[in-house]
From Swiss-Prot:
GO MF annotations, alphabetized: 3'-5' exonuclease activity; double-stranded DNA binding; endonuclease activity; exonuclease activity; RNA binding; single-stranded DNA binding
Residue span(s) of domain Exonuclease: 243-394
Pfam assignment, any one: RNase_T
Name of the featured protein: RNA exonuclease 4
Amino acid sequence: MGKAKVPASKRAPSSPVAKPGPVKTLTRKKNKKKKRFWKSKAREVSKKPASGPGAVVRPPKAPEDFSQNWKALQEWLLKQKSQAPEKPLVISQMGSKKKPKIIQQNKKETSPQVKGEEMPAGKDQEASRGSVPSGSKMDRRAPVPRTKASGTEHNKKGTKERTNGDIVPERGDIEHKKRKAKEAAPAPPTEEDIWFDDVDPADIEAAIGPEAAKIARKQLGQSEGSVSLSLVKEQAFGGLTRALALDCEMVGVGPKGEESMAARVSIVNQYGKCVYDKYVKPTEPVTDYRTAVSGIRPENLKQGEELEVVQKEVAEMLKGRILVGHALHNDLKVLFLDHPKKKIRDTQKYKPFKSQVKSGRPSLRLLSEKILGLQVQQAEHCSIQDAQAAMRLYVMVKKEWESMARDRRPLLTAPDHCSDDA
């Protein structure tokens, strides 16, 4: 059987047998249209504002953009002012290291507020970026209101901060002043500084000070309280001895306080040991206690002994013994007592002492300083110390004094009562 032939006019138009010329022209037209479309799209994109991170920010042009940005800035500033007093910062508690941390916290607090107030995309967004940057850019460019933290950020070390009108120096200034004060304070003297010899410690104390005097006394073998220690013989007999030293402290009675009355009576033995010490009740109203010299105060006499009792006790102790003292006629007078002339050893009347200190009526203070090398009666007098000093003077020249007393016994005359107290 033979195959039937299909007519050419009934073929599909899209068959590959179509003419090549017109097909090429169609594809070129389509390509041109595509190129035009993409070019127009690129132009539209270029006209739109850039939103990428590297996009150039342009200033706003429309007046509406200006007004919207101004409102956003005003609202942001009001919120900052309302939040500022909630957390007051104390300048004294802010160190130089803590200040940057506080500023960073303020930045973190402001950034979310600005983010919430971002303007819509497009021209409004362009305007907002031009005047008030949004997001992270706000932290860098926006004018942060001046707070205590930001104000003190620029302060450097050594500057002074002002709080309520008072200038508070920083720690560096205080440490510098303390260092200057320490450098200015003179160092106390040492043993190497006190190198000179044969100088009285009292003179050193007056010239240099008490610290230097202590060192000088230490070098001389003296210590504090050396006056009382040198006048008393340690580990010696503490009872009555052949010689006893007497001294009395007196107060003033009468209209002007010129008359004297016994207020304290002290007796020491030959070794400086105190064997008797009592306050005496006044028989008349005291008009002058003479505290600066006598050391007697009203409370001392309240618990005192009666004068008659003291008289009997002292007379019993002195009976048959050598009585030593300084200006003894005054002490015996206020006690209303008497003692044999040959048994009295008065340091004020001993001629070798007078010639040694070049004084016709030397005081006990002068004799102690020149002969014993001790300072007594510097302030308030003490009857025990005065009796010890008199006994010490007597013991130093006891042999010579007793030999002179034996030689002069046949030539003794009546006692001289005209001498006064030194």
